[in-house]
Regions:
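Hydrophobic alpha-helical targeting segments used for export or membrane insertion
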Residues: 3-11
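An N-terminal assembly and electron-transfer interface module characteristic of large anaerobic redox
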Residues: 11-504
Length: 504
């Protein structure tokens, strides 16, 4: 009863970075797994793609949540609070003074709830502005965003071998657009430095700044170095971190808050599918994958412990051999059979979608998928690992508080296989090929009639995979209801809202 009461009084007010399923739906579902309420603002306040969020209304909502005695933690996107979301953070718009004023409201929140836990997450601006088609009424439509991306990926300053290319790109971009881009980077850097100061003065308990989509070379390197120097000078080790990633940051901090509600520090072991797996480099992360993985363990509220773990994270890297796959699956099966918590992050999609699909099919057909506490395989190393760790931690916390919701857990895992495997490996290529056959090669923002047609095709195809996947994951359950869509009128992601029910 004490544990159940603790869960009830551990509600989390959660401000996501935008309204996409991976950053809004998944953190809320983590709460359901653990039996902890994760409350986001009304959907209308979060905006949609180029329709920016409403930070001032979200501040009012936060004050309302702060008045609730059961709200014990806050997990807040600084990009949403300062600018109106991730897309807004990459574009001119709110000036520094407006953004700074909004973030100062965090101090008001701290005054009202001095004992609440406040976690904040922000992004270090990626090198490319948001990709959008030519003619779109937003910052840097194609081809400008592509030229900016190429320019920002050069060394800073450009190497002698890059000088001519840099000059040509500057001419293609045009000085007004380049100035606006650089000013946006400067504004975001100044806001991130402010967040570090707010953490140093105790306003924020835990801060993470994620480097969004950028490799080891580019305009971001100088920003990273300055922020890392600030972090060190302010003595924030353990309270603030700078790491690769973006979309998983809110999910990881929600997992941290859930683990705190359970008074649990998860011990995490990491097992790579190849001996040198830790050194693999995701092309849009600035450091080897082990950097983000170790950082995410801490961000989720855990500690690395390869000897006596509560959860073992298995990481399947690209180019894993057939023999290594056999060893990997045997080890996961042995852990699961022993009642140990197993999370799988499959990174093979970084090289081959077909390899990823084949391994997902193997997990499902063997029954091993049903015995995992977490599965993830999407977009980047940090995205994948952060999601897998968070799901396993939510389940572990719920079990420790006696508030674990097995049906919510089944639903989360079902959606991950349906999205990460069926949509991205099977359905999305079909949608893109269909669009290309119709002469539509830019899929970053579809016209309304095209989006409606592709949504219908998405639903029809994905439903065909859904029943088969659920039959392998949970043969005693059926899909009671499911909504499928293309939430941002593009093929980059799908939305899946599923309700499972036991067979009668």
């Amino acid at each position: 009863l004490t544990h159940v009461l603790a869960a009830i009084l551990a509600a989390i007010a959660f401000v996501p970075i935008d309204d996409r399923p991976v950053v809004l739906q998944l953190p809320v579902m983590l709460g359901r797994i653990a039996g902890v309420t994760v409350e986001p603002p009304p959907r209308a306040l979060l905006g949609r793609f180029f329709e920016l969020g409403k930070p001032d209304a979200i501040i009012a909502w936060l004050n309302h949540e702060a008045a609730k005695p059961q709200t014990n933690a806050f997990v807040i996107s600084s990009d949403m609070l300062a600018y109106g979301g991730l897309t807004a953070s990459r574009a001119p718009g709110p000036n520094y003074a407006d953004a700074e004023s909004r973030l100062r409201e965090l101090a008001h929140l701290r005054t009202r709830r001095p004992h609440a836990w406040i976690g904040a997450f922000g992004t270090i601006m990626r090198l490319a502005p948001t990709g959008i088609p030519a003619g779109t009424d937003f910052f840097a439509p194609y081809p400008t965003w592509s030229y900016l991306q190429q320019y920002a990926n050069l060394h800073d300053p450009p190497l002698p071998s890059e000088t001519a290319r840099a000059q040509h790109l500057r001419e293609l971009i045009g000085q007004p657009a380049l100035d606006a881009y650089m000013a946006t980077r400067g504004r975001d850097l100044a806001i991130n430095r402010l967040l570090l100061k707010l953490t140093a003065n105790g306003t924020i308990d835990r801060l993470v700044l994620g480097q969004d989509d950028a490799g080891p070379v580019g305009l971001h390197v100088r920003d990273l170095q300055l922020l890392q120097a600030d972090l060190g000078a302010l003595g924030l080790a353990g309270r603030a971190s700078i790491e690769p990633g973006a979309d998983e940051l809110g999910t990881a901090l929600v997992a941290n808050a859930i683990a705190r509600a359970a008074h649990w520090i998860p011990r995490i072991a990491v097992r790579y599918s190849l001996p040198d797996g830790a050194s693999f480099q995701d092309p849009i992360e600035y450091a080897p994958i082990s950097t983000a993985i170790d950082a995410l363990i801490g961000l989720c509220g855990g500690v690395r412990d390869d000897e006596h773990p509560d959860i073992t994270l298995y990481v399947r890297v690209p180019t894993t051999t057939a023999a290594a796959d056999d060893t990997l699956t045997s080890a996961m099966a042995a852990d699961a059979a022993g009642g140990r918590s197993v999370a799988l992050a499959d990174l093979s999609y970084l090289r081959s979608d077909r390899d990823q699909a084949s391994f997902a099919q193997r997990l499902l057909a063997s029954g091993l998928a049903a015995r995992l506490d977490a599965y993830s395989s999407w977009n980047t190393n940090a995205n994948t690992v952060g999601t897998a760790l968070a799901e396993a931690i939510a389940a572990g916390a719920g079990r420790r508080m006696n508030t674990y919701n097995a049906l919510a857990h089944r639903t989360f895992t079902f959606i991950m296989f349906l999205d990460d495997y069926a949509y991205h490996d099977e359905v999305r290529p079909d949608l893109n090929a269909t669009l290309a056959a119709e002469g539509i090669t830019d899929h970053t923002l579809l016209a309304p009639d095209v989006a409606a047609s592709m949504t219908q095709r998405d639903r029809a195809l994905l439903w065909g995979y859904a029943d088969a996947i659920l039959a392998q994951l949970d043969p005693g359950y059926h899909i009671a209801a499911m909504l499928i869509g293309l939430p941002w009128s593009r093929t980059f992601e799908t939305s899946i809202d599923a309700a499972l029910a036991p067979n009668l």
